[in-house]
A protein has these predicted regions:
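A short alpha-helical cap/connector motif
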Residues: 1-120, 130-175
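Short beta-strand/loop segment that forms part of the nucleotide-sugar
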Residues: 124-127
Length: 175
């Protein structure tokens, strides 16, 4: 199916924050995903992000809000090409003593061996999980893996959590 047709399908079957029944995901959607950015943040976007369009701006601002909320002390980039703006953002937001690692995944051919080194506090940010058939297959394998507890599918970006003490759920959220 065409990338844009998949987007419209996702748009019509996804939910807002009121369609979620998980307190963790409701809070994530309400306080991070649907949060408005202040005008200064939008004006200070890197030029390469601004040049790629509104969709990339929204993703960049979302990643910025995620990094502000989820304290982390390590990050790993699994990308095919250099993403200088994102790397700078991750370096700027890194803290200490949080014992969380955030993985930013933007590759075509990936396997699930990455999950062997992940802890329950870690988070995966998967860029464009529907961009190609290979990425969509990887995204579906991630969602089905037993180590993955919560996935939040925003179509252009996917969030994966490994939280213990919560039942396995996959959420389609309108973004």
């Amino acid at each position: 199916m065409n990338y844009h047709l998949k987007y419209w399908r996702h748009y019509f079957i996804s939910h807002s924050r009121h369609g979620t029944h998980s307190p963790f995901v409701y809070k994530l959607v309400d306080e991070v995903i649907y949060q408005k950015d202040d005008p200064d943040t939008i004006l200070n976007l890197p030029h390469d992000i601004r040049a790629t369009g509104k969709a990339e701006e929204k993703k960049y601002l979302l990643v910025d809000r995620l990094l502000k909320v989820f304290a982390y002390d390590q990050f790993v980039f699994l990308t095919e090409k250099s993403l200088a703006s994102y790397e700078t953002l991750f370096k700027h937001r890194v803290g200490s003593y949080s014992f969380r690692k955030i993985y930013y995944v933007d590759q075509m051919n990936l396997d699930l061996n990455l999950l062997t080194s992940i802890n329950d506090r870690d988070m995966l940010i998967v860029n464009e999980p529907y961009l190609s058939a290979e990425r969509e297959d990887y995204w579906n394998k991630l969602k089905d893996d037993g180590r993955v507890v919560v996935t939040v599918d925003l179509y252009r970006i996917g969030l994966v959590f490994f939280r213990t003490g919560q039942r396995k759920e996959n959420f389609l959220i309108r973004f």
